[in-house]
Regions:
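N-terminal cationic-hydrophobic initiation segments that often serve targeting/anchoring roles
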Residues: 26-27, 57, 86-87
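Generic beta-sheet signal
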Residues: 3, 65, 93-97
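Hydrophobic targeting segments
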Residues: 2-7, 26, 32-35
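Residue-level detector of structured alpha->beta connecting loops
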Residues: 30-31, 61, 90
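Catalytic-site signature of metal-activated, phosphate-bearing donor transferases
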Residues: 49, 54, 77-285
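Active-site-proximal specificity loops/subdomain of glycosyltransferases
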Residues: 7-21, 34-67, 77-78
Length: 285
């Protein structure tokens, strides 16, 4: 069984992405790493992602293709379990993993699930054209979600903006806000097209989400590839103290309840959904 990992980055040093650490992780896990987007245009459209991701998937030679964001790793302790999981579900189009979202090295939230572990050997017609932004994988037009593919407790470790400065975040958020406006005709919850306005909207979202970051761990618990970088976060980087937010936020009982509900109860409820085993549905995919 051969595993390919597809990722993308553009000017990763300028954008302060943990790209060196991420690629080291990918090369340790996969037989092949395909890197896209090195010449991706500054002012992009969301529709630009579809052909890029499709090209990455189609050019991959692995039996399984894992689509990874460059700020996301898989823990080395899960490598063998992941490989065994791929063998177990070899007849399914994808596998869904949990997403551990980090803003600081010491707390995380189980934000969502992602169906980005894709079975190319048996489902070569997978395309990246689904979801709200048109970048999620589909099979025969069916959006791959956590409800229609097998689910694993293995996690994607997502570091989001941990290593970025306020200036880098502001410019990134403004670029994405402009792309959002070009696609949907409004800015939604992204604020506006200037760095200042986009950052303000983003930071309000961060404050809301950080309230649910109630699960704690030590730096040594992280994937080994990223530990040294986490130990050397500078004061002007978001992950140092969230630009002051870390010291000012006061969590309520509701915040803890919501965090535990999303991590445990929602998974418990989801465990009863076995629709992915429906052979008729699987044949349609």
């Amino acid at each position: 069984m051969k595993i390919s990992i597809v990722t993308s980055y553009t000017n990763p040093e300028e954008r302060m992405d943990p790209w060196i650490e991420a690629v080291e992780c990918y090369e340790s896990l996969a037989d092949e790493v395909v890197i896209l987007g090195e010449n991706f245009k500054q002012e992009f459209s969301f529709s630009d992602f579809t052909p890029m991701f499709n090209d990455g998937f189609n050019s991959s030679t692995g039996d399984w293709v894992i689509k990874m964001d460059i700020d996301t790793l898989i823990h080395e302790k899960d490598f063998e379990l992941l490989k065994n999981t791929l063998k177990r579900y070899e007849d399914y189009p994808a596998i869904s993993l949990r997403k551990f979202q980090f803003f600081t090295p010491y707390r995380f939230h189980t934000k969502s699930r992602m169906g980005m572990v894709l079975n190319k050997k048996k489902f070569k017609n997978i395309q990246f054209n689904g979801g709200g932004d048109g970048c999620d994988p589909t099979v025969n037009g069916i959006h791959i979600t956590e409800k229609n593919v097998p689910r694993s407790n293995i996690a994607f470790w997502n570091y989001d903006a941990v290593f970025k400065t306020k200036q880098v975040i502001s410019e990134d958020r403004a670029r994405f806000a402009r792309a959002w406006f070009r696609k949907f005709g409004d800015f939604g919850d992204r604020g506006g097209d200037t760095p200042e306005v986009a950052f303000k909207a983003w930071f309000e979202m961060i404050e809301s989400r950080y309230r649910k970051h109630v699960f704690k761990l030590d730096i040594e618990d992280h994937p080994k590839f990223i530990i040294n970088k986490l130990k050397n976060i500078k004061k002007d980087q978001f992950g140092y103290n969230l630009f002051g937010l870390q010291n000012s936020i006061e969590r309520t009982y509701t915040d803890y309840l919501e965090a535990f509900r999303e991590r445990f109860f929602s998974e418990f409820v989801l465990s009863f959904d076995k629709s992915y085993k429906n052979k008729n549905f699987l044949n349609n995919m």
